[in-house]
Structures are given as structure tokens and as C-alpha cells.
């Protein structure tokens, strides 16, 4: 039996495990409120005058931050796997994240001089949350026995989902207002008086996400055990990068089936993330949705994703992981094409429908209802694809390579995360079309699916 390292973290008590899982709850508003449903659509459709140009800038900022994260991940991963405490690194990257989120406040409508500040702030927040997550993930194996790692990981995933839904419901229900009515999603006056003419509610989403993070990450810092002691930083970097190169060579030479799956997953995960990041932006551009509609849209989509994840677990045991991924991908791609087929006065690219009439109420037009339907399809598919991807890897990798290959699994989710956003930014800038720009994500999804087909489901 291998002996424990002298500076290894002690197994966590219940409050330590809950504290670790709350990291996902703490970070989720960044993804839900800022990246997907509220601030990003405001940046494109409210902060700047030209939505296509704004989308390309937002995509470039996303891609640049993800590229930086991908470049730093191997080095930081080596540090995280060495005998160094993780919490100081998480604290440092948390400061980056919170400062970046607070910088989004400067996105006053029409303030073109603030565009570089806002984009830099968003990139800083993105880099901070991605790198803090590297160290938080590295804490997990030392907190609980190996046979219960899946349970802990699943708990954190569920807690993160709940955090996104709760933060979205609170902000949309009590703070962010419809510019036309001055009311929140619940029909209430905002809990804090804010200037609608300068879109203070939308701009406050960043600082609120930062404050949410500071409050709910505290249990992790206070109660979750960490490694103690220290070794020099240089040694684990050299050793970790050397091991990474050796492991990559072994993967490509002796485990090509696993390598093919990781390549497929890298592409379809990148495309799927891009659809989520830019789908809300596109919907808001087409129908002129404000914070109220976007909040409701986000809640509906998140609930759909939750139910999809629940169903996917049952299907995985019934028809197998690969079949679930393929089936989920077909639904996801159909939903993404459907979303892009919707315009203000047409659906399915050429079927005419009556345009939106503001006085008829929220989501009253046929185009909006079609957009919701296709978005729910995406939500239903994304959970099963994510969960079954992890399960498939566990089933096809050799038992003695599980930890190593799951490291590649995590790494593959980051290494090309910049590609789809940068491609979307470039195509949007070249064509001036938001629809054509976002359609690039379909290429990643389809190629990833095609590469998955020959993957064997046995070791």
C-alpha cells in the first residue's frame, strides 16, 4: 500500500466536502449571469451600437482568455499535483476573477472609450475562474476515498447547477428590470433603485457575481483541508511537464482509441460551449429581448438541462454511454440549427411567421416560441452528453490509467476552448452577420461527432 505524503491533505469532514462543492455554487453566476444570459447579450445589444462588431469583440476576448488559460494549464496542473498548498493559488486567481467582474460595471451604454476596459475585465475574470478551477479540481482526490469520488463530483455538479438557477432567479426576479416597464421578471420594482437609462442593473451583474463568489467560496477556504508544507515551485513544474510529455506519447502510441475519443470530445465540447455562450446573444439580437426575457429564457433552458441530465443517467445504463452521446449530439445539433434558423419574421430559414408584437406579452410570437423550443432541445441534450462523455472514458481506459487519462480529459476540455470563440469572432467580423459567425460552432459539433463514431466501447 502506498504511503501518504507528509504534506498530503487529510480526508475531509462533511463540512469540508460541502465547502469544496460550494466552489461550483460560487463560480456559477459567472457562467450563467455574465457569459450566457445577461451581461453578454447586454454587451452586444445594449452597450455598443453595432451588434455584429460587438459580438466579434466579445468572441475575441473570450478566445484570448481561453487561449491564455490553455497555455498556463499544464504548468499550473503540475504545480497543483505536487506537494504545494492549493488554496493560496485559488485565492490569487479569485482576486483576478473578482476584480475583472467588478470592471464590467464600466460598460455604460455608448461609452466607447470603456470598451477596452470592459473587454480586459471580462478576460481577466475568465482567466481567473478557469485557473482557480484547476486548483480546486486538484483538491478533490485528497478529500475522499476513490470509490466515492464520483458521488462528490456529481454533488458539486448539481450544486453548481442549482447555484446558477438560484442566482439567475434572484437577479432577474428582484433586480434587473425591463427597460420598457421598469419591472423585474416577477413584476416588482427593483429591490435597489437603479438608473434604467444607463442600464445600471445590467452593469451590476458583474459586481454581483463577484460578491456572490466571495461569500460562497468562504466555506472552502475555512473548512476544506489542503496540503501543508512546501517544496520549490520549479521542481514540480519540471517533473509535471516531463510526465505530461511521456504520458502523451504513451497515449498516442498505445491507447489510440482513447486518444481518438479525447480528440472528438475536445471538438464537440468546444462547439457546444460556443453555442451556449453565443446562443443567448443571438436570441436577444433577433427579438430585442431585454433582461426580463433573457432571465426567463435562462431559467427555462436551465430547467430543461437539469431534466435532461436526470434522464441521461438512466439512458446511459440502458443503451450505453456512446449511444447516449451520439443521440444527444443529434438532438443538440438539430436544436442549434433550429436556433440559427429563426429570425424576426421567419423560422426554419424560410417559413414566414408574424413578427413580434410587444404588446402581446412575453414569448407571444411564433418566432420566439420556436426559439424557446429549439433552445430547450439543446438544454435537454447537453447534460447527457457531458455526463456520458465522462462515463465512456471510464469504460474504455485501462484501469491503471484512469487518473492519468482523466487528467487528459480535463485538459482536452481547455486546450482548444479558444478555437470556436476566435473563429466566431473572425467570421462575424468578415461577414457582418451574427448568424454566420455562430454557425461556425456547428462545424466543431459535427466533426466531433464524426470522430466519435469509430471509437470502440471496450478496452
Q: Each PLM stretch: what is its role?
A:
Residues 91-112, 330-364:
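C-terminal ends and interior cores of transmembrane alpha-helices
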Residues 71-85, 307-321, 342, 347, ...:
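Helix-to-loop junctions at the C-terminal end of transmembrane segments
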Residues 80-96, 317-332:
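Cytoplasmic membrane-interface "Motif A"-like loop-to-helix N-cap segments
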Residues 52-56, 146-156, 291-292, 399-409:
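Loop-to-transmembrane helix entry/capping segments in MFS-fold secondary transporters
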Residues 2-18, 225-263, 356-362:
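Juxtamembrane intracellular "pre-TM" segments in multi-pass secondary transporters
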Residues 58-78, 168, 299-311:
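Central cavity-lining transmembrane alpha-helices of secondary-active solute carriers
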Amino acid at each position: 500500500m502506498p504511503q501518504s505524503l507528509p504534506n498530503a491533505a487529510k480526508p475531509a469532514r462533511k463540512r469540508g466536502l460541502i465547502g469544496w462543492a460550494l466552489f461550483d455554487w460560487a463560480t456559477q453566476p459567472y457562467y450563467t449571469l455574465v457569459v450566457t444570459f445577461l451581461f453578454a447579450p447586454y454587451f452586444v445589444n445594449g452597450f455598443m451600437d453595432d451588434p455584429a462588431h460587438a459580438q466579434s469583440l466579445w468572441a475575441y476576448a473570450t478566445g484570448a482568455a481561453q487561449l491564455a488559460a490553455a497555455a498556463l494549464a499544464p504548468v499550473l496542473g503540475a504545480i497543483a499535483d505536487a506537494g504545494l498548498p492549493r488554496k493560496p493559488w485559488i485565492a490569487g486567481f479569485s482576486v483576478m476573477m473578482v476584480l475583472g467582474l467588478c470592471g464590467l460595471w464600466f460598460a455604460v451604454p455608448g461609452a466607447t472609450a470603456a470598451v477596452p476596459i470592459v473587454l480586459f475585465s471580462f478576460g481577466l475574470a475568465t482567466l481567473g475562474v478557469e485557473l482557480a478551477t484547476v486548483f480546486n479540481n486538484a483538491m478533490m482526490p485528497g478529500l475522499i476515498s476513490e470509490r466515492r469520488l464520483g458521488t462528490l463530483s456529481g454533488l458539486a455538479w448539481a450544486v453548481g447547477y442549482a447555484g446558477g438557477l438560484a442566482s439567475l432567479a434572484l437577479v432577474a426576479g428582484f433586480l434587473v428590470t425591463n427597460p420598457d416597464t421598469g419591472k423585474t421578471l416577477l413584476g416588482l420594482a427593483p429591490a435597489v433603485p437603479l438608473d434604467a437609462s444607463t442600464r445600471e442593473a445590467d452593469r451590476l451583474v458583474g459586481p454581483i457575481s463577484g460578491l456572490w463568489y466571495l461569500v460562497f467560496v468562504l466555506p472552502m477556504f475555512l473548512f476544506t483541508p489542503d496540503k501543508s508544507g512546501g517544496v520549490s515551485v520549479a521542481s514540480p513544474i519540471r517533473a509535471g511537464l516531463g510526465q505530461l510529455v511521456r504520458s502523451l506519447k504513451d497515449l498516442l502510441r498505445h491507447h489510440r482509441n482513447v486518444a481518438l475519443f479525447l480528440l472528438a470530445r475536445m471538438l464537440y465540447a468546444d462547439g457546444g460551449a460556443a453555442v451556449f455562450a453565443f446562443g443567448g446573444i443571438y436570441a436577444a439580437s433577433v427579438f430585442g429581448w431585454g433582461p426580463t426575457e433573457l432571465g426567463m429564457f435562462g431559467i427555462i433552458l436551465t430547467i430543461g438541462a437539469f431534466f435532461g441530465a436526470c434522464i441521461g443517467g438512466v439512458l446511459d445504463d440502458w443503451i450505453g454511454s456512446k449511444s447516449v452521446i451520439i443521440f444527444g449530439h443529434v438532438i443538440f445539433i438539430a436544436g442549434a440549427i433550429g436556433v440559427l434558423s429563426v429570425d424576426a419574421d421567419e423560422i426554419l430559414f424560410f417559413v414566414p411567421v408574424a413578427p413580434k408584437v410587444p404588446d402581446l406579452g412575453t414569448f407571444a410570437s411564433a418566432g420566439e416560441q420556436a426559439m424557446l423550443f429549439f433552445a430547450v432541445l439543446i438544454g435537454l441534450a447537453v447534460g447527457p452528453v457531458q455526463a456520458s462523455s465522462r462515463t465512456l472514458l471510464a469504460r474504455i481506459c485501462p484501469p491503471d490509467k484512469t487518473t492519468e487519462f482523466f487528467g487528459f480529459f480535463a485538459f482536452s476540455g481547455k486546450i482548444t476552448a479558444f478555437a470556436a470563440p476566435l473563429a466566431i469572432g473572425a467570421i462575424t467580423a468578415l461577414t457582418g452577420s451574427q448568424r454566420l459567425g455562430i454557425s461556425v460552432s456547428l462545424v466543431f459539433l459535427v466533426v466531433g461527432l464524426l470522430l466519435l463514431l469509430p471509437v470502440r466501447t471496450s478496452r
